[in-house]
Amino acid sequence: MSSSFGKIFRVSTFGESHGGAVGVILDGCPPKLKVDINMIQNELDRRRPGQSDITTPRNEEDKIEILSGIKEGLTLGTPIAMLVRNKDQRPRDYDNLDQVFRPSHADGTYHLKYGIQASSGGGRASARETIGRVAAGAVAKQLLKNFCNTEILSWVKRIHDIDSDINKEKISLNKIDSNIVRCPDEKISAEMIERIKQLKRQGDSCGGVIECLVKNVPSGLGMPVFDKLEADLAKALMSLPATKGFEIGSGFSGTYLKGSEHNDAFIKSDDIRKLRTISNNSGGIQGGISNGENIEMKIAFKPTATIGKEQKTVNAEGKEVLMRAKGRHDPCVLPRAVPMVDAMVALVLVDHLLLNQAQCGLIDN
């Protein structure tokens, strides 16, 4: 069971949804990096359950504990251990599901592969596992900001069939966090919130799309063939719970264009090390390597699998049964998934930044 991610900037998460705690070991972080613990806590607060009436009612404080690797606000270059204790877990909510495979959950596949069942809140398959990722991602975001002035901004673009068209030039973290659904369009966000509440009352759920914009990306991140930057971003983002799709740049819509329409023409620049393009259909990555333009991505999240409606399924004996979920869950995962997307993008970019420095740092281009 793989619980580690990254090559140099390596993250290993641990813990289960209804266990004693969840956390992360972050190895490979450079020493003497200034780390704002409050910023880490703020990122955890953004993904915390119980933050609004459109998220799960599970009420966790999610207070971060730094066990090692940071002293007096500076990284030591040693493994950084961070922990969050579970305080509002209710495993008994799942007692009636011990031998039942919940539709579109990990119960059935975990049983087939490992001979165990992750019915109690999903175990390692739960979004609670992402606490460690978000904490590590907050460290990565600070490293990117300090060394490259790189900024990662993710927001909810679509909920169910309610879509938005955001002006990326005017996007900001304050606008994203100005409402509980994390869509920076005031009118559209109100419609999204009402749709989520409507489905929640019906015992149902919905999915949607998160859009991500990365500004001030260093050129040269990523490597040809098997370690392309977009390939690692896709793997990282598709490893998040409930993800079902990934696009970069023009994505699937680019298939409707001709080559003459899709090509990103280069334009004259005073600094040849900073290639600029008229358009950005490539999404800031060409040949698997960042070109210095903004990286633009979209990530699709399925409707929450745990719903309040009665459903047909089978038990461990293969017999058909009826079940109705009793556990606390999000009617829509997207508002809390925004900081998860930020974190995974930051972890990939920092890992590639360090890889690029290791391979090309001594080369004078």
From Swiss-Prot:
Top-level EC class: lyase
Binding, NADP(+): R47
GO biological process, one term: chorismate biosynthetic process
Pathway(s) of this molecule: Metabolic intermediate biosynthesis; chorismate biosynthesis; chorismate from D-erythrose 4-phosphate and phosphoenolpyruvate: step 7/7
Gene Ontology cellular component annotations, sorted alphabetically: cytosol
Manner of cofactor binding, per the entry note: Reduced FMN (FMNH(2)).
Chemical reaction(s) catalysed: 5-O-(1-carboxyvinyl)-3-phosphoshikimate = chorismate + phosphate
Keyword Flavoprotein (UniProt): yes
Keywords carried by this UniProt record: Amino-acid biosynthesis, Aromatic amino acid biosynthesis, FAD, Flavoprotein, FMN, Lyase, NADP
Function of the molecule: This reaction introduces a second double bond into the aromatic ring system.
Quaternary structure note: Homotetramer.
Name of the featured protein: Chorismate synthase
Species whose genome carries this gene: Prochlorococcus marinus (strain MIT 9215)
Gene name of the encoded protein: aroC
